[in-house]
């Protein structure tokens, strides 16, 4: 997308200038897109995914026009550090483009003998065995990559970092309130239509409860990081001062934020998503340990805050809003051997799938059409996706591209940990916590589900990953 002299110019070190009104409007438009993405079935329909990419491309094109006019630029320090993960995303999209590029049969046979054998037409062939699906996959992937770039380009001040986190909290709270209301009222509506799946559990405007759970965890990560940045660092002496502190808390925006987090936890429990809930509390605990380890000194306030999330959310809120049913579902794993074995066999057969296309993959988005060729008699039914993001990326894109995506996430996680170790600014440290928690959630939940194949969740995830580089390299109280 950007190379050569343009790479140097886009982050040219110039005298800091104030944000132009147009650039501010683009930031607002990008935030609106982040809120829109989960609404039309999590953008997991071709029309919705295409519209999402079109909206992101329009904002990116407008930003480039401002850049060419000298009225916008990526912060130099952010660009210097974040261009490597951006290039990794671009390289993956270039690989998907190659998958749908017609090549001589001899080249296809050398790169992917199985693909060459399975093609039924003559002439030049493609590495992808489903050209249309991979074409849409590329379109969607370009949109996700644009989302990562727009974060780097537009979230360029302390105020915008805070606003970005607040936008995710707002969107997550809205999804949570809507999903919980639909369950508790019995209306059972999704996105302007009656739900045809997930009745009796919270799904919001998503179709799958596990994907709403994943989205809520990312929004909870943003809210938790925001709340951590607001922890008081003043020492309190005496019961009168402590009472005044509690009264100030009840009247402060911090208390409202805590209520929003509670609403999201209620909806998370109401999804009855086993791994969604397990991944949330595991990610919260592990990210908390990372934050405590990264801190310059042990913080009892942070320990108390994290403990309050566990105690209040799990015992009190969960008890009122169906934690017992979630626990029954977790305990009922032994009685659902068939379901668990179906996941085992899916993973088993997907490994055979990967062995057939180890280097090139079968083409982005082609899993639904190729997997039946490897599906044995132990696994019945039709599957659009593997219930394992790691395996699906490997099967469709090939192992090298899948490892590149793992490297992309690992780089962002490392940067998030460094933010918590080296930065003093509480907001940026809170943002680093949010990224760390989101990555740990994805690492856990991706073993049993396909959250990252859902456009809204993938866009939200890469936006949070970009925040690691933003919070690690923005100067304090300064912006371009």
Regions from the PLM with identified roles:
Residues 96, 100-116, 130-133, 178-192, ...:
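Aromatic-rich transmembrane-lumenal/periplasmic boundary elements in polytopic membrane proteins
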């Amino acid at each position: 997308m950007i190379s050569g002299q343009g790479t140097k110019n886009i982050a040219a070190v110039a005298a800091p200038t104030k944000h132009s009104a147009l650039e501010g409007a683009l930031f607002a438009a990008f935030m609106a897109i982040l809120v829109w993405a989960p609404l039309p079935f999590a953008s997991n329909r071709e029309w919705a995914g295409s519209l999402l990419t079109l909206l992101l491309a329009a904002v990116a094109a407008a930003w480039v026009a401002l850049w060419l006019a000298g009225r916008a630029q990526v912060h130099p320090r952010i660009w210097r550090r974040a261009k490597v993960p951006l290039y990794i995303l671009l390289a993956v999209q270039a690989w998907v483009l190659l998958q749908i590029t017609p090549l001589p049969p001899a080249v296809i046979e050398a790169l992917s003998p199985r693909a060459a054998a399975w093609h039924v037409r003559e002439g030049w062939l493609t590495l992808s065995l489903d050209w249309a699906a991979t074409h849409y996959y590329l379109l969607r992937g370009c949109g996700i990559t644009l989302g990562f770039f727009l974060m780097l380009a537009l979230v360029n001040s302390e105020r915008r970092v805070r606003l970005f986190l607040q936008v995710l909290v707002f969107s997550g709270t809205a999804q949570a309130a809507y999903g919980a209301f639909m369950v508790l009222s019995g209306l059972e509506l999704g996105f302007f239509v009656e739900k045809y799946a997930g009745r009796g559990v919270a799904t919001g405007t998503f179709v799958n409860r596990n994907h709403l759970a994943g989205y809520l965890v990312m929004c909870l990560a943003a809210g938790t990081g925001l709340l951590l940045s607001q922890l008081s660092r003043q020492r309190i002496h005496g019961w009168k001062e402590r009472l005044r502190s509690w009264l100030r808390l009840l009247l402060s925006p911090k208390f409202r934020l805590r209520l929003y987090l509670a609403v999201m936890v209620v909806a998370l429990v109401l999804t009855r998503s086993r791994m969604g809930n397990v991944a949330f509390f595991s990610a919260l605990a592990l990210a908390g340990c990372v934050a405590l380890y990264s801190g310059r000194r042990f913080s009892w306030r942070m320990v108390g805050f994290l403990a309050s999330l566990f105690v209040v959310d799990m015992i009190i809120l969960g008890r009122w809003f169906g934690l017992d049913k979630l626990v029954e579902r977790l305990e009922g794993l032994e009685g659902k051997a068939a379901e668990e074995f179906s996941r085992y066999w899916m993973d088993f057969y997907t490994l055979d799938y990967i062995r057939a296309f180890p280097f090139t993959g079968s083409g982005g988005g082609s899993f639904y059409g190729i997997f039946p060729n490897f599906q044995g008699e132990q696994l019945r039914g039709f599957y659009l996706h593997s219930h394992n993001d790691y395996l699906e990326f490997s099967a469709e894109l090939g192992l090298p591209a899948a490892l590149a995506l793992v490297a992309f996430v690992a780089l962002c996680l490392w940067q998030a940990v460094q933010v918590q170790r080296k930065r003093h600014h509480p907001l940026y440290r809170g943002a680093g916590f949010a990224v760390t928690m989101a990555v740990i959630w994805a690492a856990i939940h991706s073993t049993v589900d396909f959250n990252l194949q859902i456009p809204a969740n993938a866009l939200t995830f890469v936006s949070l990953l970009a925040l690691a580089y933003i919070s690690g390299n923005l100067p304090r109280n300064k912006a371009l």
